[in-house]
UniProtKB/Swiss-Prot annotation:
<feature type="binding site">
    <location>
        <position position="115"/>
    </location>
    <ligand>
        <name>S-adenosyl-L-methionine</name>
    </ligand>
</feature>
<dbReference type="Pfam" id="PF10294">
    <property type="entry name" value="Methyltransf_16"/>
</dbReference>
<keyword id="KW-0489">Methyltransferase</keyword>
<dbReference type="GO" id="GO:0032259">
    <property type="term" value="P:methylation"/>
</dbReference>
<feature type="binding site">
    <location>
        <position position="152"/>
    </location>
    <ligand>
        <name>S-adenosyl-L-methionine</name>
    </ligand>
</feature>
<dbReference type="GO" id="GO:0005737">
    <property type="term" value="C:cytoplasm"/>
</dbReference>
<dbReference type="InterPro" id="IPR025784">
    <property type="entry name" value="EFM7"/>
</dbReference>
<keyword id="KW-0808">Transferase</keyword>
<dbReference type="InterPro" id="IPR029063">
    <property type="entry name" value="SAM-dependent_MTases_sf"/>
</dbReference>
<comment type="similarity">
    <text>Belongs to the class I-like SAM-binding methyltransferase superfamily. EFM7 family.</text>
</comment>
<protein>
    <recommendedName>
        <fullName>Protein N-terminal and lysine N-methyltransferase EFM7</fullName>
        <ecNumber>2.1.1.-</ecNumber>
    </recommendedName>
</protein>
<dbReference type="GO" id="GO:0071885">
    <property type="term" value="F:N-terminal protein N-methyltransferase activity"/>
</dbReference>
<dbReference type="GO" id="GO:0016279">
    <property type="term" value="F:protein-lysine N-methyltransferase activity"/>
</dbReference>
<dbReference type="InterPro" id="IPR019410">
    <property type="entry name" value="Methyltransf_16"/>
</dbReference>
<feature type="region of interest" description="Disordered">
    <location>
        <begin position="1"/>
        <end position="25"/>
    </location>
</feature>
<comment type="function">
    <text>S-adenosyl-L-methionine-dependent protein methyltransferase that trimethylates the N-terminal glycine 'Gly-2' of elongation factor 1-alpha, before also catalyzing the mono- and dimethylation of 'Lys-3'.</text>
</comment>
<keyword id="KW-0963">Cytoplasm</keyword>
Length: 265
């Protein structure tokens, strides 16, 4: 028979089978961010000025933050409603999907908001669409703002099925804060080229969160030529950086770059 000391060592005293610290920590809870449409254009189908979006609590894909690039993109859409109203819009890597929501409020004919097919991430986008576009109720007919889980470069069928009959490309493709994925540049450009309508344009917006890799970020626009896409700088603006204490010059991290991509003639 084992002694009391031996029993303690096997069943608790040494915590041989104890869970590691943090094993029972609850995952971070989702949270909300408010966006104000400061200049709603006359052409907008909806006059909503406040857009309240839910963000996942945490995400290895950085979908838990409302990035400067998403805010810039949303403002750009309101400033250029002719690019959206009555047109078909695709957003890649949508995260909280603010630009897609604004496109839906503006009166796009069809919006498809996509991100990596993670259940929490895609479910959160669907929540935002349901609540911002449809008032928290399921749409009674085919939704003009749809949500899809999508991996760049994969089969386009699930995205194209949302397009009107006879149309195979989107009039506007949105890429907000995606070019930091340097290994994915080719897949992003392939997807953009193949899903962009002949006379369409892509709006690419990003901030150099790692200033020492800015050259690699910008390489995206050089590589675009290999895919028959022409890059045009719209502007570079300076906002407050996302994270004040991140490494690298704050002046560089505060930049927001915006480009158009169009098919070469």
């Amino acid at each position: 028979m084992s002694s009391d000391h031996e029993e303690d060592s096997l069943y608790g005293a040494t915590e041989l089978f104890g869970e590691p610290d943090g094993f029972y920590e609850k995952p971070a809870e989702s949270h909300f961010a408010e966006y104000e449409r400061s200049a709603v254009p006359a052409q907008s189908a909806r006059r909503d000025t406040q857009v309240r979006i839910r963000l996942v609590g945490s995400s290895p894909l950085w979908g838990h933050l409302l990035w400067n690039s998403a805010i810039y993109t949303a403002r750009h859409l309101d400033a250029h409603p002719e690019q959206v109203v009555g047109r078909c819009v695709l957003e890649l890597g949508a995260a909280g999907a603010l630009p897609s929501l604004v496109a839906g409020l503006l009166g796009a004919r069809q919006v498809v908001a996509t991100d990596y097919p993670d259940a929490d991430l895609v479910g959160n986008i669907q929540y935002n669409v349901d609540h911002v576009i449809y008032g928290g109720k399921p749409p009674t007919e085919a939704p003009h703002v749809a949500v899809e889980g999508y991996i760049w470069g994969n089969d386009y069928g699930p995205l194209r099925r949302h397009l009107p009959p006879g149309q195979t490309g989107f009039d506007l493709v949105l890429l907000s804060d995606l070019v930091f994925n340097h290994t994915e540049h080719h897949k992003l450009l392939q997807t953009t080229r193949d899903l962009l309508a002949p006379a369409g344009r892509a709006l690419v917006v990003f901030s150099p969160h790692r200033p020492w890799l800015l050259e690699k970020d910008l390489q995206f626009f050089e590589t675009a030529a290999e895919y028959g896409l022409r890059a045009e700088l719209i502007e570079q603006v300076t906002w407050a950086p996302m994270f004040a204490d991140d490494p690298g010059p704050a002046e560089v991290r505060a930049r927001v770059y915006a480009y158009y991509l169009t098919h070469c003639a």
